[in-house]
Amino acid sequence: MDRKIDYLIVGQGIAGTILSYKLIKKGYLVKVIDDGHRTASSTKAAGIVNPITGRSYVKSWMIDELIPEAIRTYRSLENELKGKYYHEHTIVRVLGSIYEENKWSSRLLDGAYSKYIIEDYDTSSLDEHFKDVKSCAIIKGGRV
């Protein structure tokens, strides 16, 4: 007798893959269908993990809980599949006005943001496109 499928997941992009992985780890029988469509969002999305976003440089919703869980999940998946899926990256954000510089400065002083900010960053190592930039925010981020 065939076991009944507990979950049917349509699409095996980043979200579908992680959801199916988590459900399988919990003992559920999962079926994933995917048409391999080249215009699927996972082929277009950069998979960027940016903990500080928006004009006011606020922490992304639930980021303190989500990043550690994401890293644990990807590391577990990497271990099982012998691949590399989560990559830590530096995010450079150009500060184009005094307002933006002031907002960023307030984040530098806020301890709740410190684990996501790189303060002493050698900007001379940045790409030549940033050579005329007077001020920038350096954020610890990642990508999938």
Describe each PLM feature range.
Residues 2-15:
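Beta1/beta-strand and adjacent pyrophosphate-binding region of the FAD-binding site
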Residues 7, 30-31, 115:
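Hydrophobic anchor at the start of a short beta-strand
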Residues 11, 34, 95:
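Short beta-strand/turn micro-motifs composed of small residues
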Residues 24-43:
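Glycine-rich FAD pyrophosphate-binding loop
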Residues 42-43, 85-86, 129-133:
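Short, flexible turn/loop "capping" segments at secondary-structure junctions
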Residues 48-127:
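Dinucleotide-binding Rossmann-like beta1-alpha1 core, especially the glycine-rich loop
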Residues 135-144:
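Helical element adjacent to the flavin cofactor pocket in flavoenzyme catalytic cores
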